[in-house]
Structure formats: C-alpha cells, structure tokens
C-alpha cells in the first residue's frame, strides 16, 4: 500500500506542477482562477448604470409665451412637464404636513424655501418612468439654482430663455386678463421688475456656462416654435420620441446660444 502511495506521489506532484504552469501561462496565480470566475459572473449580472435624466429649464417673464411653448415642446419631444408652482399647489391640496407648512408661508406672505421646492421636484424626478424633464419657470432665483445643484446634484442640459420686450409682455397679459387696465399695468410692472431683479443673475450664470439658448419671443406661436425645434433635435436622446423633421434648421436671427 505504501508503495502505491509512493508511486502516486510523483503523479500528483506532476499534475500540480502542470496546473501551476497552465495558470502561470494565462497570467493567473494559483487560487485566482475561481475568484476570477466569480468576478466575471458578478460583472455579467450587475445592472447597468442608470442614465442621468435630461433636464431643461425654461425661463421667461410674464407674458413671454413660455407656457405655450412648453406645451408644444412636451407634445413634440415627450418630456415630462414640471412646474414648481403646480407642485406646491398640489402639495397643499393633498393636505400633507408639508402642504400645511407651505400654505401657512404663502398666507403670511413669505417665500417658500428653495429646499422645499427642490425636494418636491426631486420626488418627481425619482418617481417618474420618464427620464426627460421640462421644468417650467425654475429656477427663479440664484438661491433656487444653488439649492437644485446641491440637492439634485445635476446640471440642466438646456436652459431656454424666452426674451420678449416689456411692452409686448404687458400687451399680451392685458389682452389675456381683460381686467382694469390701470391696475393690471401697475401689477405687471411690479412683476417685471421682480423678474428682472431675480432672474437676471440666473440667466447670466447659464449664459456663462454655455447652456443658455435665448429665443426671440416675438412672433406667432408656430413661428417661435420653429426656432425652438432645432435645439432639441440636436440631442440624440430626444430624437427617438421626436415627431418633427430632425433636419430642421436654426434661424440665427431668432435664437442665440451663449456657448
């Protein structure tokens, strides 16, 4: 029996040496083969990284026509439309603790903290199956912008600014409201003054980052939209859902990119 073991020992030793040589030839140390198999299996089953959402901010003064253009963008490219104001109103209507706090702030004439608004936006971004978003009328202030970057940890892909002369915006709002002209003019001038004071730093910030597209918002709805289309057609992730000709050309007189 001992002789049989002695005879087998060289064979076992030889097999071991062969295994070592085979693994060495393939760049593996003894014992690494099994671990490598496990790693490769884990790589195969690990889920792919989730794509970052496509985010568009839409800015413009009261009467600039941005709301109408938002509707056409959503319809054409399949983006999900988010409005900070709508989200706040919905939270109030749901009678949540957060909604009660928002309502009390508004009743007291206080500004809703940026963090509250951004977290409502974050909730929509995370719960939606859509990965393309159009955020209307946001950010209104530098504080909004900073809070968005800090909480969401993302930059917008596109920032649209519908630039419209003050006289045209006043005329549009007065025609729309059909109320007392003196009161409306006074209110409009106050709103425009606030918009310019708060929004201008945001607009300048994104202009310096090369993300701002300034649209001349004078003209018919369809004419203006024809100069919005090429901006979105230039992004591959939007072409699949686009219902327009991707060869549309940009009218240089109506749109300006700050990049």
From Swiss-Prot:
Q: Which GO terms describe its biological process?
A: 'de novo' pyrimidine nucleobase biosynthetic process; pyrimidine nucleotide biosynthetic process
Q: Which cofactor does it need?
A: Mg(2+)
- Alphabetized InterPro entries for the sequence: Adenylat/UMP-CMP_kin, Adenylat_kinase_CS, P-loop_NTPase, UMP_CMP_kinase
Q: What domain of life does the UniProt record list for this protein's source?
A: Eukaryota
Region feature (NMP):
83-112
- Keywords from the named record: ATP-binding, Cytoplasm, Kinase, Nucleotide-binding, Nucleus, Pyrimidine biosynthesis, Transferase
Q: What is its EC number?
A: 2.7.4.14
Please give the chief subcellular localization of this protein: cytoplasm
Sites where the protein binds CMP: 144
Binding of ATP, residues: 63-68, 176, 219
The places in or outside the cell where this protein is found are: Cytoplasm; Nucleus
Q: Where is this region: LID?
A: 175-183
- Assembly notes: Monomer.
The record's comment about this protein's domains reads: Consists of three domains, a large central CORE domain and two small peripheral domains, NMPbind and LID, which undergo movements during catalysis. The LID domain closes over the site of phosphoryl transfer upon ATP binding. Assembling and dissambling the active center during each catalytic cycle provides an effective means to prevent ATP hydrolysis.
Q: Which HAMAP family match?
A: Adenylate_kinase_Adk, Adenylate_kinase_UMP_CMP_kin
PANTHER family from the UniProt entry: NUCLEOTIDE KINASE
Reported function: Catalyzes the phosphorylation of pyrimidine nucleoside monophosphates at the expense of ATP. Plays an important role in de novo pyrimidine nucleotide biosynthesis. Has preference for UMP and CMP as phosphate acceptors.
Could you identify this protein by its name?
Answer: Probable UMP-CMP kinase 2
Organism field: Arabidopsis thaliana
State the organism's lineage.
Eukaryota, Viridiplantae, Streptophyta, Embryophyta, Tracheophyta
């Amino acid at each position: 029996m001992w002789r049989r073991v002695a005879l087998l020992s060289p064979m076992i030793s030889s097999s071991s040496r062969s295994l070592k040589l085979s693994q060495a030839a393939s760049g593996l140390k003894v014992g690494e083969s099994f671990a490598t198999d496990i790693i490769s299996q884990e790589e195969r089953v690990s889920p792919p990284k989730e794509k970052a959402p496509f985010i568009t901010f839409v800015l413009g003064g009261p009467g600039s026509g941005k709301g109408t253009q938002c509707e056409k963008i959503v319809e054409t490219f399949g983006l999900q439309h988010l409005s900070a104001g709508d989200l706040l109103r919905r939270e109030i209507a749901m009678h949540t603790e957060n909604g009660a706090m928002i309502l009390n702030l508004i009743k007291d004439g206080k500004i809703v903290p940026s963090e509250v608004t951004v977290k409502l936006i974050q909730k929509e971004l995370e719960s939606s199956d859509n990965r393309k978003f159009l955020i209307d009328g946001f950010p209104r202030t530098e504080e909004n912008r900073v809070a968005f970057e800090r909480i969401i940890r993302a930059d917008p892909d596109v920032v649209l600014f519908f630039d419209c002369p003050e006289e045209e915006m006043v005329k549009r709002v007065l025609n729309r409201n059909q109320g007392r002209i003196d009161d409306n003019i006074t209110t409009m001038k106050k709103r425009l003054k606030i918009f310019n004071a708060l929004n201008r730093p945001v607009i300048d910030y994104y202009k310096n980052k090369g993300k701002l597209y300034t649209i001349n918002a004078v003209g018919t709805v369809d004419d203006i939209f024809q100069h919005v289309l090429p901006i979105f057609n230039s992004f591959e992730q939007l072409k699949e859902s686009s219902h327009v000709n991707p060869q549309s050309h940009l009218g240089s007189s109506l749109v300006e990119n700050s990049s």
